[in-house]
């Protein structure tokens, strides 16, 4: 098990045959957290006299995504919404926490996908999943080209009622990847296929915001683990307590 924390990274080694448990702590490496993870694995194996080649599973808990949100160091995110819903993140649910004083002191955080990087798709899906207005692909291409010129690093697609019919979102992603193959695209019908467009939008935008950094981190870590341990399987702790 591996859990990076600042300033230390904790490691726990379990021998499934003997039931023996060993632990170790090493300094974290903020510039590249994967280095600290690998150092910790090497340390706990050395202490336990276990060869790295004997490790079969690495279960990893990380706060890379959380830290990215808290420090505001995520990707430059573009957003595609249905025409008429461009300000979905700004309007939100018009909810202010607290009593009357909340209206005076509450400071709403800036959306992770700013309004100037939000475009509208001319399309409409009904609540029953029926196509009310066919997606205007030519207008979409023009809008996506303008987003590409803004040097976005990730793209979110959140169309009204897409949880009932994801056809238009999937088409938007297809066109976006054609125009911006290097930009990762997250669509709400896959991230959180649920009712309520604001909640769907903000969740999928958050996914896009942390995605490039988390993808790079996990890919680098997995690559290094496989190089050192060959048959090892990497599992990452999810927010619900499960492993993926």
Residue ranges and their predicted role:
Residues 1-244:
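N-terminally biased helix-coil "hinge/interface" segments that flank
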